[in-house]
Amino acid sequence: MADLDFSSEQLLEQARGNQTAFWHLGLRWARERDGSVDAWAGFVGEQFAPSWDELGEDASAHEVARLAGLNLATTADMRPVELSGDDSRAEVVIEGPDEKWLTEWDTTRDDNDRANELIFRAIAERRGMTLEARRDGAGLHLVFARR
């Protein structure tokens, strides 16, 4: 049984890789099936958004942005690098996805960004917020703002 005693670090690394592979496979499947990731990402966002209800009706934009960063930090190819703002407006900047993953799974940065935009927009709207998503040299910017 000693061979099956995995360290927390081994388990985390394996889980991050598996999660990232499933993400990229979902992107590629949607692109090949529908020509776009929009329907798939919209569905994923609708399914995940209720799990953020525990934040309450007046959720802090800063907390929503922080949790978005946490979710993306659990992947093997994206890293939150900056969090700023306050309860009414907050921004998280995400580096990635890594080119290695895009090449290996035949996905694109544009599809990845679009899917994240649609998923986090569904979450933001359910929390009474707007989401602005844009990419520049620093990475993918997700800006959450109270309405």
Q: Which sequence ranges carry the predicted segments?
A:
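Low-complexity, intrinsically disordered Gly/Pro/Thr-rich segments
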Residues: 117-133
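N-terminal accessory segment detector
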Residues: 1-91, 98-115, 133-147
